[in-house]
Amino acid sequence: LVEVDDESWRILKEKKVPWPYPRGDIWARAVENLSKAGAKVIAFDIQFDSPDARSEYLRSVSNTLPAEFQQYLPGHGDVLLAESIRNAQNNGTKVVMDVKMVREPTRIPPTYIAYPVPEIMEVNPETGLINDMLDTDGFSRQYSIAGYMDHEPNTAYLTLGMKCVKSFLGMSDSIVPTFNEKERVWKFGDLRINAYGKTNNFLVNYYGPPSGYKIPGDNSYKPWGTFPRFSLSQILDTQDYDIPEDIDWMSQFIPGQVPDWVLQIKDSSEQKEMMSMLGIGSEFDIEKSPFYNKIVLLGVSVEVLHDVKSTPFYNYMDLSQLTPGMETHANAIQTILHGNYIDVFGYKTTRYIVDGS
């Protein structure tokens, strides 16, 4: 998980970077760094279906500037993000952008997919649906395999988690999910996904409480760490990008870069030993990167943005703990990759008998 968490929110605020973050300065750089660090799949739980606001403003005022100043304006954020996605894909990294299935009763047809802006779609990233699936009590337990539209009943629009799995396993675009009603199983290539009744959903087998949650009042406890998590500010922190509390953290996982704090070791033998331990410099080993051959989800966990869900671990250890929305995708992905499904006796009938819903 790469999160817009409290740390990155504070650090980028000190750097005068406004939310929503500029796509060229922030998200394009994140994609570039993660791809260089060996990520196999990069997925966004952030929508880019409208133009980059900062770039659009600069475009609107650029014509009023003298010609000699126009050359100093930064490139359009959507174009820069698209270029970083293209470069990542050329580097062997799959990039998955989130999309939404939207319904407008007065529109014909009423249902459509809200895709990222054309500049991004032109470089052909994968796309995956992020529409919420909530139970009657408001908890997130189910996850959709795909969405379908009435005017395209035979076209399966895979969800974000499913697209991540497809990209990670290198599955062909020709493979589509099919439902075995007798077994109540969805088949997707070699995968068998236990359906929740006769729906196109399955129950997520949550692996634990929210990864970044810490027991309040006791600093000796570390966050739960259900999934490895990193602050967005760490991913941006390289030699060519200065931030408050700058240590070039990400440089140790990028070929050809050595963090400043390593270069500042005065004893040459100690410096060489440290570089060897980190596997950087001439002995660089990409497999030591925590992102190597991994699915990396980018999203938000900072409380002010309110993208949180109630999950089965909401009252874990009698502590109310909301899970960032991006982490529900991570749990769904891990459930599929492990084949670790929850079997429901009686399917949905059991729930109807118990709660009368």
Regions found by a protein language model. Give the residues of each.
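Non-transmembrane functional regions of envelope-associated proteins
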Residues: 1-199, 203, 291-357
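Acidic, S/T/G-rich, low-cysteine, solvent-exposed domains in lumenal/extracellular/periplasmic regions
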Residues: 144, 165, 214-328
